[in-house]
């Protein structure tokens, strides 16, 4: 079991009025030279959470911190004009809160960033 001491939350940096399937996210990462999705969890707008990389496999989401972190990504992050915005839906917020709580319970020495 690898030592996890950090949870990093990301967004897909896609417009909030567009959708991005887990498969499309995986393809985006592969086109950038990664071996699949770099995040461990992906939260869709409806609050559905997808395991996109096993937690025991080192992520590719936060250079310099991948070996000791878990990456969570939510769909969205840009407004309809492409500017950074908090586009999280109530469902995404609830799922994110629950997922982080579960991860922190499982790994008492982990911090959120």
Roles of regions detected by a PLM:
Residues 112-113:
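Single conserved hydrophobic/aromatic residue that forms the stacking wall/gate
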Residues 2-109:
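Active-site-adjacent loop/helix surface patches within enzyme catalytic domains
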């Amino acid at each position: 079991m690898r030592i996890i001491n950090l949870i990093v939350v990301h967004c897909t940096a896609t417009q909030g009025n567009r959708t991005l399937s887990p498969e499309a996210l995986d393809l985006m990462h592969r086109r950038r030279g990664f071996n699949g999705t770099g995040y461990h969890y992906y939260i869709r707008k409806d609050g559905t959470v997808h395991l996109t990389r096993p937690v025991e496999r080192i992520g590719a989401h936060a250079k310099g911190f991948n070996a000791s972190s878990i990456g969570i990504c939510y769909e969205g992050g840009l407004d309809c004009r492409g500017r950074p915005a908090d586009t999280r839906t109530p469902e995404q917020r609830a799922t994110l809160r629950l997922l982080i709580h579960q991860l922190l319970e499982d790994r008492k020495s982990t911090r959120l960033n």
